[in-house]
Amino acid sequence: MPEDRLVIWPAYFDLERSRGQGRRVATANAVRNPKLEDIIRASKDLGLDPVVETEKCYPKNWYEQPGRVLVLKKGSKTKTLRSIARALKKRRS
């Protein structure tokens, strides 16, 4: 994996998951059942040049919802996740 990119899994934004199950954003910014396509659109809107890897599976839940997104590293991972989460929330409302 290139060092100029961050790995983004849909589980990071899933309102149904606990932090222990892989959610990385606050419940106020999380969405129900985030789709890979939604994350891609939100990342494009933020200018993060997303690259999709559909064959990859989240290690904690290797048996469900395959796919991850690699985005440009433009700051800390936490700030990037918050930005994507806000964009996802905005698209859903």
Swiss-Prot record:
* Entry's localization field: Cytoplasm
The GO biological-process annotations, alphabetized, read as: SRP-dependent cotranslational protein targeting to membrane, signal sequence recognition
Q: Which UniProt keywords apply?
A: Cytoplasm, Ribonucleoprotein, RNA-binding, Signal recognition particle
Which branch of life, at top level? Answer: Archaea
The terms describing its cellular component in GO are: signal recognition particle
| GO MF annotation list | 7S RNA binding
Family indicated by similarity: Belongs to the SRP19 family.
Physiological role: Involved in targeting and insertion of nascent membrane proteins into the cytoplasmic membrane. Binds directly to 7S RNA and mediates binding of the 54 kDa subunit of the SRP.
Q: How is the quaternary structure described? A: Part of the signal recognition particle protein translocation system, which is composed of SRP and FtsY. Archaeal SRP consists of a 7S RNA molecule of 300 nucleotides and two protein subunits: SRP54 and SRP19.
Could you identify this protein by its name? Signal recognition particle 19 kDa protein
- Species source reads Methanothrix thermoacetophila (strain DSM 6194 / JCM 14653 / NBRC 101360 / PT) (Methanosaeta thermophila)
